[in-house]
Amino acid sequence: MMYRVKEIFKSIQGEGFFSGKEAVFLRFTGCNLWNGRKKDRSKSICNFCDTNFVGTDGKNGGSYNLAKLISVIKNVWNHTYTSEDKFIVLTGGEPLLQVDDLLVEKLKKENFFIAVETNGTIKTDLKFDWVTVSPKENAEWNLRKGDELKVVYPQYKFDLKKIINLDFKYFFLQPKDEEKNRTNILKTINYCKSHKPWFPSFQIHKSLGIS
C-alpha cells in the first residue's frame, strides 16, 4: 500500500487533552466530508474546516510505502526531540481513510504512542493508544467511543447534555474558528462553566504562531 501524505512535521499538540505535548504530526491527504477545494466549501458536509489536506506538497509530503514512511517519521522525531517518550498524532483530512494495521503495528514497534484524530464517520478496531473523535453535525457518526470527544462549537444539532453519556473519558468544546471567533470563544467558556464535564479547548498553536 502507498500512503498519500500531505505533511509530516514537528510541533506541540495545540488542542485537547495533550495540549503542549511535543509530537510528530502525520497529516494524511484527503477527507470524506470535504474535498478541500474552497469553491466547494459552502456545499460540503464540513464547511468550517481550517486545515489544508489537499495534495502531497507540504513539508515531507509525498506518496510513501510503509518502510519509507516510518523512516521519515523517525527522522523527524530524532532530529527534533531527545525524549524517548515518542508521540505521534495521525490526522488529516480523515486519517482512517488510509491508516491500516501494518502502519499501527510498525509505529508501536518503534515505541511511538499513537494518537489519532478522526471525524468519527469510520468505525475502527485498530489498536491506537489514544482516540480523539470530532464529529460533525451533518455527517454520520459511527465511532461513538474513544478517549477524547472534541466538539467544535457551536454545532446546534448536537444535544450536548446527552452526548456526555457516551463512552469517552474527556469531553472538550472547541470554539469554531471563523469570523465570529471571539463570540464563539465566549459562548464556549460560558457553556463549559455551567455544564460539566465539558471543558474548553483552545488552539494554542495558532496563538503561538506555529503549525
Predicted regions and their residues:
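Conserved Radical SAM active-site core
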Residues: 3-10, 36-128
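Conserved AdoMet/S-adenosylmethionine-binding subsite of the radical SAM
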Residues: 84-87, 96-211
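Generic preference for well-ordered secondary structure
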Residues: 10-15, 19, 87, 91, ...
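Flexible, acidic/Gly-rich N-terminal and inter-domain linker regions that tether
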Residues: 1-52, 199, 208-210
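Conserved beta-strand segments that form the floor/walls of ligand-binding pockets within enzyme
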Residues: 4, 25-27, 89, 132, ...
